Amino acid sequence: MKKVLGLLLFTYQLLIAQHQVAFLHVEPQATGMVAMSSAFSEIPFELAGGMIVVQASVNGETGNFILDTGAPGIVLDAKNDAFVASYKGGSVNGILNVGQVLVKDFQLGIIHEEKTQGNLLDVHHLELACGMDIMGLIGYEVLKGYEVVFDFPNHRIQAFKSGTTRSSMQKPTLALPFMLCGHVPVIVGKVGGKRVFLGLDSGASVNVLDRKYFKKIKAANRSNVKQELLTGLENTPNQVMAADVTETRLRSTSLPPMRYVFTDLGCLRDNFDIAIDGLLGIPFFKDKVVSIDYGQKKVFIWE
C-alpha cells in the first residue's frame, strides 16, 4: 500500500507545475579582497530549469553556478556530504541550516575574490531542476560593486564597475531606485492594482507574492488559477496557489501579464526582518534587458 501511495504522489508531482526559488538570507559575513582587472566583462549564460547558469571558478575548479540576486554571496554545494551548521538561514518555505566555508579564490569575469567566507548548502535538488551539475550560487557580496546587466535577448551577462559610462547602450525605457532589504534589491510596484514591495531575485524561476495577496487581488485580475509546487533552498516542496495576474506596473510602465505563486513569506519577516511582499523572478527578467546598478542603487529596464 505504501508503494502504491508513493507512486501516486510521484505521478502527481510530475503532472503539477513545479518551481524553484533559490532565495537565501543569512546574517552578513566577512568578505575578502576584490580585484577589478578591467572596467567591463561579458559572460554568456544558459537558462536551465528557469534559472540563469554561468561559468565561474572556485579554488581553480571551473563549473556551473546559478547567478542569484536573491543569494547573500558565494554559496557552494555541500556535495551531499554532512556539514556542521554554522547558522540558520531563511528561504521562501522556511528555515534551514547553513554551513560556512573559506573560499580561497573565486573568479567570475572581471570579478576576483580571495580568502572570502562562503555559505555551504546541499543544492542537489537544483541540479535535478537544471539537468546539470551545479557548483553553487553567486549573489550579493560578489556583485555589490558592479552594475550587472541581464541581457536576455542575447543570453549574456554584462558586468561594469558601478558608475562606468555605458555609451553603447540606448537610453533605458525605465529607471527605478531600489533599496536594499538585507542583500536583496527591492523596488516598489503594483501587482493587480495592489502596491507591493518586490525583491529582484534572478534565482527564482517564478514570481512570488505573499499569500495574502491572492484574495486582495480581484478575481477579475487573476486567470489560469491552479495549485502548483514551490520549492525553496530547504528542498521542501510546498503546494501553493498560482495565477496569471493581468498587470504588473512599475511607475507608469505596465508589464504584460505574468504568473505568480502565492506563499507565506512570514518566516522571512518574523525571523529575519526581510519585509517584502514578493519576488520578481525570471518571468520579469526574460524578453528584455534589465540592469541592477548596486553602486547607484538603481534598476534600468530596456524593452
Regions found by a protein language model. Give the residues of each.
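Bacterial Sec-dependent N-terminal signal peptides
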Residues: 1-22
